[in-house]
Amino acid sequence: MIPARPSILFVANAGPEVGGGHVMRCITLARALGERGADCAFVCTPAVAALLEVFGPEIPREEATSLEPDDIADALTGVRFDAAVFDHYGLSRGHHEALAKGRSTLVIDDLADRPLAANVVLDSGPGRQASDYALLTDDKTRLLLGPEFAPVRPEFSHLRGAALSRRGGEVRGVLVALGLTDVGGITGRVVERLRQRLNGVTLDVVLGAGAPSLPGLIKIASRDPRMTLHVDTQEMAQLILESDFAIGAAGSSIWERCVLGLPSAILVLAPNQQGAAAALAEREAALVIDVNADNLDARIDRAIVRLMTDAGLRARLSAASAAICDGLGAGRAAEAFLQVIASRDSLPHPEGPRP
């Protein structure tokens, strides 16, 4: 039987190519589960550990040499757990079954492109339909679809009222947040486009300690008083609150900006971001730019000019984005998964310490 306080193990991918968004949203979900009576731990490679050190230092870990299926299995040898959460595009049904061994399983996904073995699937894409998973999951799989289930840290919903009440004024501050890993050095490229057009506007730039753009941006910030760097910041909610528009990535951070109604141009940096970006564009909730498009600099320039000069556009983007996500999704997802865990008998666990 499942104990009163279930142990839940997270497998979330991270690295220079995939970024840190998988781990970040899993940290948020893990904390929501912890607040509701679960004990959570992460299977941890060095890339995952680097994020946990900064953003989830209290979370226990099970070390793994890599997040390849065999190495995950080795890391789980002797570990006692009651349920698993997978946020890893490289794992599909066979891997989920082999690793979870009959335990309750939640899979966080954005692609709907492979078979999944899951009691619960969480896909926060705004255009996602149940039919997208009809051939990929079991009939009994519970689907948590749409931004209402997006795992967003609670500080964003706490600031929602204050943020929405200050939208609509002049542009005084701009935020650049293109992912902690700064894929391809895109942050430096965008900052250079912005600096040519800021005049008296301030610029807050968020990125990780290992971002390839960081050394160059440190030099620029030292001689440009308009610009402030925020490295591995814990204050993203406050930065979004105080900004008047953003140039951001089209990953899971889009929900943070939606909760606080921040007008944004979003850059599609990876194929898994295309669906959510297209859905936001269709709802006129963001300006969307694909980094693989021709004339990228010109497209960025046009978006900057529109956001700087068109107050009506900013107001429309703010209202449309705020209507998409309220920031309470982590709690909804945690409660749904705990209900599933409580309703199922677990297979006997291998002997070993709980994570």
Pin down the residues of each PLM region.
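A nucleotide-sugar donor-handling region in carbohydrate enzymes
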Residues: 117-185, 210, 214
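A short acidic/histidine/glycine-rich donor-binding loop in glycosyltransferase catalytic cores
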Residues: 264, 282-294, 306
